[in-house]
């Protein structure tokens, strides 16, 4: 292995970039649907050795010195995001005549842009690089900053954050009940990269001991938490039905199919409970499951009232229209409705974080001013964003915290209001992406929100994956991808919050400060030894 490390260190130019690309591609195997945890313990040591091989000319300026580490980081990131996001092209094949031209932008262009974040990570690390275990701290710091930025820069896209690779199953998710994802991102990189010290690093014992301690604590806390009794359901118990209709996206876009789609949802809602279980108190439909503007269709509300039993509540994804007034065109929102057994809409919540290029076109006015109005006109979407995400209170007092579609991937946006809720609600339509890794990755990220908040989650997805998840991230019931049917169960209870949002933020900044100090002292000492 030492010989292999030496060969990687000596690589340069295209060969170095290609190995970086392969290392990033390998790291994807640690994410769903593969969950091969060990892959990250190979890819990150390779990245360390590639950075070890950077030997800039002392006469070069600062910019030229950073080109090599930037190229390494970008190639690693490009491989990682290309391997993890290629399935986005499927969404553009649904209406291929209109959007096939954009497939290269989604499949290659987006990974190329996201690779810049990992280029920044490696540049930061290289600035604090040394020959000891401090360089592992520097790499963890760099990735911690990069992943934090990826969560909000240009509207944010923290999909497949490195930390998720360290949490492939509920046993390994429990640390998220104490620290936030940003902290886990940093510590995961430290642990993943630590094996590089075995063959190429001074002070290996210290670095490896810290990595082993972190990994052991991560696993031990998981065993401890899962060994505790499952949180009991709050009284009175609430029976939940989750509907997964499995409707092809092309069919959903066909206006002629609207009535049959609506009736399909109603038939699943009315299906008898298997095994003589309790009749559902709440029925949940996926995102945009109501295929028309509900407020313009009183007959549809009447049909819902016919199907719902006394006291039942329907929570359904729908497009909501709002009159803008003054002769302006209506505004449309991707929403969740709460509908009672009389067919009355008694609550609604609109999506706050819209999908760029899917639900709206970023910088549309700027593109139009540049003469690119044809591009703006060809893009899908046209939704407006809500300013806040309310907690929906149901009859009886139960409270839902709604997250529509990919809002569930933004861990930092699940605010203090979520702690007021009794259940997290995630409705989505992943039919756009087909039977690919995308829906599995999406589900895995949503599952973590239950662990972070200590609140159970109801997830309704058109084609899957639908589930009821308890407050520890354990699956109570699940319907896999493309399985049509319903889930009937009793809503699990909440768990006490171990740390609040401000405390987790402080832990993140403290961890970043510690890594900065370790890396800086290691670098400072390294420079003294060189001189």
UniProtKB/Swiss-Prot annotation:
TM spans, by residue? 8-28, 34-54, 69-89, 105-125, 136-156, 178-198, 207-227, 507-527
The record ties this protein, via SUPFAM superfamilies, to: Carbon-nitrogen hydrolase
The UniProt GO MF terms for this protein read: N-acyltransferase activity
| Subcellular compartments | Cell inner membrane
- Give the UniProt record's GO annotations in the biological process aspect: lipoprotein biosynthetic process
The keyword Membrane belongs to this UniProt entry's keyword annotation: yes
**Pathway note:** Protein modification; lipoprotein biosynthesis (N-acyl transfer)
Which controlled-vocabulary keywords does the entry list? Acyltransferase, Cell inner membrane, Cell membrane, Membrane, Transferase, Transmembrane, Transmembrane helix
What broad class describes the main subcellular location of this protein? Answer: membrane
Give the EC number(s) listed in the UniProt record.
2.3.1.269
Question: How does this protein lie in the membrane?
Answer: Multi-pass membrane protein
- GO cellular-component terms in the record? plasma membrane
Q: Is Membrane tagged as a keyword? A: yes
All residue ranges annotated as the CN hydrolase domain in the record: 243-493
InterPro entries recorded: Apolipo_AcylTrfase (IPR004563), C-N_Hydrolase (IPR003010), C-N_Hydrolase_sf (IPR036526), LNT_N (IPR045378)
Residues of the active site are 287 (proton acceptor), 351, 405 (nucleophile)
Pfam families reported in the protein's UniProt record = CN_hydrolase, LNT_N
Explain the purpose of this protein. Answer: Catalyzes the phospholipid dependent N-acylation of the N-terminal cysteine of apolipoprotein, the last step in lipoprotein maturation.
Sequence similarity = Belongs to the CN hydrolase family. Apolipoprotein N-acyltransferase subfamily.
Q: What is the designated name of this protein?
A: Apolipoprotein N-acyltransferase
Species in which this protein is naturally found = Sinorhizobium medicae (strain WSM419) (Ensifer medicae)
């Amino acid at each position: 292995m030492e010989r292999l490390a030496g060969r990687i260190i000596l690589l340069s130019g295209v060969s170095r970039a290609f190995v970086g690309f392969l290392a990033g591609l390998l790291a994807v195997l640690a994410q769903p649907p593969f969950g091969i945890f060990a892959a990250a313990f190979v890819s990150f040591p390779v990245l360390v050795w590639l950075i070890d091989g950077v030997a800039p000319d002392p006469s070069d300026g600062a910019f030229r010195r950073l080109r090599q580490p930037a190229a390494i980081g970008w190639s690693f990131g490009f491989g990682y995001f290309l391997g993890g996001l290629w399935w986005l092209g499927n969404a553009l094949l649904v209406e291929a005549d209109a959007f096939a031209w954009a497939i290269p932008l989604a499949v290659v262009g987006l990974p190329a842009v996201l690779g810049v974040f990992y280029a920044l990570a490696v540049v930061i690390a290289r600035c604090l690089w040394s020959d000891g275990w401090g360089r592992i701290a520097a790499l963890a710091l760099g990735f911690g900053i990069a992943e934090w930025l990826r969560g909000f820069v240009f509207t944010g896209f923290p999909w497949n954050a490195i930390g998720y690779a360290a949490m492939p199953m509920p046993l390994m998710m429990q640390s998220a009940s104490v620290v936030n994802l940003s902290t886990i991102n940093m510590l995961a990189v430290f642990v993943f990269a630590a094996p590089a010290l075995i063959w190429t690093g001074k002070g290996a014992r210290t670095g490896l001991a810290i990595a082993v301690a972190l990994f052991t604590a991560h696993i031990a806390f998981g065993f401890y938490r899962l060994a505790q009794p499952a949180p009991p359901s709050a009284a009175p118990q609430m029976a939940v039905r989750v509907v997964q209709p499995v409707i092809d996206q092309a069919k959903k876009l066909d206006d002629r199919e609207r009535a049959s789609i609506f009736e399909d949802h109603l038939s699943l809602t009315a299906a008898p409970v298997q095994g003589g279980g309790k009749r559902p108190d709440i029925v949940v439909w996926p995102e945009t499951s109501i295929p028309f503007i509900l407020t313009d269709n009183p007959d549809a509300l009447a049909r819902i009232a016919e199907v719902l039993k006394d006291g039942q509540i329907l929570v359904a994804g729908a497009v909501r229209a709002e009159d803008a007034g003054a002769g302006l065109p209506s505004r449309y929102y991707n929403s969740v409705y709460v509908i009672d057994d009389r067919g009355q809409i008694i609550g609604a919540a609109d999506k706050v974080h819209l999908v760029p290029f899917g639900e709206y076109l970023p910088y549309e006015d700027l593109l139009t001013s540049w003469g690119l109005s044809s591009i703006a006109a060809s893009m899908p979407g046209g939704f407006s964003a809500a300013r806040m995400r309310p907690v929906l209170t149901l009859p009886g007092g139960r409270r839902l915290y709604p997250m529509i579609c990919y809002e569930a991937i933004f861990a930092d946006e699940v605010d203090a209001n979520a702690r007021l809720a009794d259940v997290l609600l995630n409705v989505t339509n992943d039919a756009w992406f087909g039977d690919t890794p995308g829906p599995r990755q999406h589900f895995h990220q949503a599952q973590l929100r239950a662990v972070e908040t200590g609140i159970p989650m109801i997830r309704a997805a058109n084609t899957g994956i639908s589930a009821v998840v308890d407050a520890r991230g354990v699956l109570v019931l699940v319907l896999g991808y493309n399985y049509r049917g319903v889930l009937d169960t009793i809503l699990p209870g909440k768990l006490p919050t171990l740390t609040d949002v401000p405390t987790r933020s402080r832990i993140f900044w403290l961890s970043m400060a510690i890594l900065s100090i370790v890396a800086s002292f290691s670098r400072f000492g390294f420079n003294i030894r060189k001189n």
